Regions:
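A structural signal for isolated positions on well-ordered beta-strands in alpha/beta enzyme cores
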Residues: 11, 35-37, 60
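Glycine-rich Rossmann-fold phosphate-binding loop(s) that bind the pyrophosphate
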Residues: 14-16
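Short helix-loop-beta connector
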Residues: 2-9, 32, 92-93
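Rossmann-like adenosine-cofactor binding region
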Residues: 56-143
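N-terminal Rossmann-fold NAD(P) dinucleotide-binding loop
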Residues: 19-20
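Conserved beta-strand elements of the Class I
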Residues: 10-11, 170
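Adenosine-phosphate binding glycine-rich loop
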Residues: 104-192
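NAD(P)-binding Rossmann-fold cofactor-contacting core
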Residues: 28-53
Length: 192
């Protein structure tokens, strides 16, 4: 729905339990065609993810976040960061980003310029993402920007509201809605 079907490289930024779940879910949906990379502030925690997940997929630890982000087709952020980790200049056309870590006020993983650069900006729940999430930083200076955001449910019901071509940058800001998680899982499994 949002990532290109020909995506080859997936970068996971973060090393907690959720990193493992994200890797497992991408393997389940997209198969083993992806080369996974994991980056974390602590290399030993990234190594732990690699050791555990190498039983499931092809995965490596990376130390150069910028180089890995520049090369990634899909980026998943799942950290507790309060400052941007992924900068706008690092993201190439066609990249999809799922931002999961900014699930509370004050958290931020993406540079605001990157969110501004997105061709498609999707929220699991707009009002919640405006309160806390990557979108909260995006609308902070201009509330009219809310009109450019679509809810994930709208994309699930009408895929044309998601990615329309392979050069678009798409961002999904996921702050956590349980009912949405269930609907997404079912829809993705049905469509892939």
């Amino acid at each position: 729905l949002l990532a290109r079907r020909d995506s080859k490289r997936l970068l996971v930024i973060g090393t907690g339990r959720q990193a493992r779940y994200q890797i497992e879910s991408h393997v389940a949906v997209m198969g083993l065609n992806l080369q996974f990379q994991v980056w974390g502030r602590l290399s030993e925690r990234a190594d732990s993810v690699v050791n555990e997940m190498s039983k499931v997929c092809s995965i490596e630890r990376v130390d150069d976040l910028e180089a890995s982000a520049r090369d990634a087709d899909i980026i998943v952020t799942i950290t507790g960061s309060t400052a941007p980790l992924v900068l706008s200049d690092w993201v190439k056309p066609g990249t999809h980003i799922t931002a999961v870590g900014a699930d509370a006020p004050g958290k931020q993983e993406l540079e605001v310029a990157l969110v501004e650069k997105a061709d498609v900006l999707v929220a699991d729940h707009i009002e919640q993402c405006v309160d806390h999430g990557e979108i909260s930083h995006f609308v902070q200076t201009d509330d009219t920007r809310k009109s450019t955001i679509v809810e994930l449910g709208q994309v699930l019901n009408n895929p044309k509201m998601g990615r329309r071509n392979d050069s678009q940058i798409t961002i999904a800001d996921q702050t956590g809605i349980a009912a949405c998680d269930i609907a997404i899982s079912q829809s993705v499994l049905n469509s892939w």
